[in-house]
Amino acid sequence: MINRRSFIKSVGAGTAAMLVPPGLTQAAIGKHTNVILIMSDDTGYETFGCYGSEQYKTPRIDELAKTGLRFNHCYSQPLCCPSRVKIMTGKSNVRNYVYWDVLDPEEKTFGNMMKDAGYATCIAGKWQLYGEGTFAPELAGKGTLPMDAGFDEHCLWRVKEGGERYWQPQFSVNGTMTSFDDEDAFGPKICTDFICDFIEKNRDKPFFAYYPMMLTHVPFVTTPESREASGPKICTDFIFHPAMRWLDEAFIPEQQKFEDMVTYMDTLVGQIVDKLEEVGVRENTLILFTGDNGSPGGSKGGVVSELNGISIEGGKGKTTDAGTRVALVANMP
C-alpha cells in the first residue's frame, strides 16, 4: 500500500531524474515534464464522485481519475498546517514540525528542489506558514516566506497578514499586500487565474505550480456559480434523511453551501486543465490532486456526507479514517 508522502517522493525523484543540471540550455533539456500539485482544503475522500459519491458534483476531478490513477488509500494529517509542512518537505511531522502556522526556514521544500532543477515555480492559494503569532507570540515571523521556499511567483492568503479569503479578499501578490475590492472578486477564482497566467507565461519552459486551495474551508459561502440563486437551496429529501436529524433546519443551507463550494472547487480544477490544453502543454504535464485533511466535523460547522449508503460525519481534527483519508489522483496523458 502506498501513502501520499511516498508517492509524492517517488514522483519528485522520477521527475528530477528526467532533468539535466540547471546550467544547461533550454534546448538541451528537451522534452520536460511540468508538474501541477493541487491540494484542496477540508474535503475528505467521500466528497468526490470518483470515490463513489452521488451527493457531490465533481465531474472534472472524476475525469482525471477515470483517465489517470486514483489511489484508494491516501492519508494526510487531520489538520491543515501539519499537512502542509509534511507535503512540502516530504518529512514526517515528528522530524520537522515546529508549531502551528510555522514552517522551519531551515527546511528545504519541493519548491526549492524544483527551482534548483531549472523549473519556473509558482504558488497560489493558502500559505499560513510564516508564523502569525496568534498562539505563540514568540514565533511571530519565525516561519518561512514563499520566496524562500523556492517560489518565483505567488498569490497567497495569510502570508504576513490575514484578511478575507473569499469575497473581496486580501492577498500577498509577489510580496505586495493587495486588496481586491470589486464586488465580484472571489479569492479562489483570483488564485486560479493567477496560476493560469503563470502557465501561459511559461508554456515554453519547465514549470511547477503548487495550488494549496482555500476551498472548501469554513466559512461556508456562496460561490460565483451559486451566488445568484434565489433563497436557500434546500433538498427536502436530504433534510429528512435520518443522518441529518441531529442538525436543526437552519443549518441545512450551510450544508448546501459546502456542497456548492465542492462543485466550484471542481470547476476551478477544470479551468486549469483547460488552460493546459489551450496552450498545448497538457500532454507533458503531470497533475496531482489531493487534500489536506478530512471534511469539517462538529455539531456546528460540520458536514455529513452519504457514500455507498453510509453516512460519514466530517472528521477533521480527529485521527480517524474520516479525519485523515483524502483523495489522491494522478493524471498525465
PLM segments and residue spans:
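Formylglycine-dependent sulfatase
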Residues: 2-333
